[in-house]
Structure formats: C-alpha cells, structure tokens
C-alpha cells in the first residue's frame, strides 16, 4: 500500500513539476529506513513551498545517519549524524538557491513541534559596503620619506596618490651654497697671502 501511494505521489509530482524529497535514517547494520516524504514546489509568486506528504510511524532512539534524496536532482547520503528519538519533534530545513533549486537540507530538534515540520530557507544577501570616493593627495619627497621611517614600517599610500619628485639640486642647494662660500673664503685668503708674500719679497730686494 505504501509503495503504491509513493508511486502515485511521484506520478503527480511529474505532472505538476514538483520535487519529492525522501528523508530516511540508517546505521551500519541496516538499510535506510524512511522517516518522511515531502513535496517541494514553486508558487506563482516565486516562492517555494514544502508540503508534508507522509511521516512514518517509527520508534527510534539512538545515533543514526540522516539521508535525503530527490530523484535526479539531490542525493545526500548521511548529510548529518545525530541522535534521533521519538516522537519526531524536528525542523526539516530546506535550503534553496536564487533559482529556487534545493541545495541542501538539515534537521534540528524543536521541542515545540508535534512532528517533523518542513521550512524553506532562502539565501540571504550579505552587507554592502558604502562607496567612498577617494580623495586625491599630493605628497612631497620629504613626506614620503617621513612616512616610510615612521614606526620603522613602510607607509601605505592611498589609491590615486601622486608623489612629487624633487631634483637633486633642489634637495642640496644649501650644501652647495655653503661649499661655495667656504671655497671663496679659502681662495680669497690664499690669494691675499700670495699677494702679501710677493710684496714682502719686493721690499727685501
């Protein structure tokens, strides 16, 4: 009788384009034992419904593998290993993608349930970071060097940043000027000494 009923359900699902989810449990010593049958269908407004077709009257207590199968679409042997006990007060959570296709199922205990209750879980959109326009900055060579030396780490520059390069003459003009002054002073002193020595020689003659 049960086999005939399942055949009728499968035939009806093929006509109405609904999916039939078979939920079962098993251990190492026995074949899969049915827990329930659920019909998954898409509504005209784009949502997904899960209807309980049949819940098996079983007596179970212990740890088992849970299995889920949608013929031709989903095969999840031992998708969870958990402790089962009767009465079957569980939530059957059916996860679907953006195209309302079943991707996975899970089972969790809920003491408020009278039997296995199926619910649909849709994908949640993640948080969207606000778009921040980067400001354009101009840094001199000195700023870049100071940033690199700060805390002994390499500075990280913001995007769209321009570094103004300075020529060697612009960086070292003070040293050049100081060297030129020293050179003129030394050269002038040497010239005066030469002139003074030449005058003394003329007087001696």
Curated annotation (Swiss-Prot):
It is a single-pass type I membrane protein. Residues 1-17 form the signal peptide. Pfam families: ECM10 (PF21203). Glycans are attached at residue 47. Residues 191-205 are cytoplasmic. Its main location: endoplasmic reticulum. Residues 18-172 are lumenal. GO terms for biological process: protein insertion into ER membrane by stop-transfer membrane-anchor sequence. Keywords: Endoplasmic reticulum, Glycoprotein, Membrane, Signal, Transmembrane, Transmembrane helix. GO terms for cellular component: EMC complex; endoplasmic reticulum. The chain crosses the membrane at residues 173-190. It is found in: Endoplasmic reticulum membrane. Component of the ER membrane protein complex (EMC). Present with 1600 molecules/cell in log phase SD medium. Part of the endoplasmic reticulum membrane protein complex (EMC) that enables the energy-independent insertion into endoplasmic reticulum membranes of newly synthesized membrane proteins. Preferentially accommodates proteins with transmembrane domains that are weakly hydrophobic or contain destabilizing features such as charged and aromatic residues. Involved in the cotranslational insertion of multi-pass membrane proteins in which stop-transfer membrane-anchor sequences become ER membrane spanning helices. This is Endoplasmic reticulum membrane protein complex subunit 10. It comes from Saccharomyces cerevisiae (strain ATCC 204508 / S288c). The gene is EMC10.
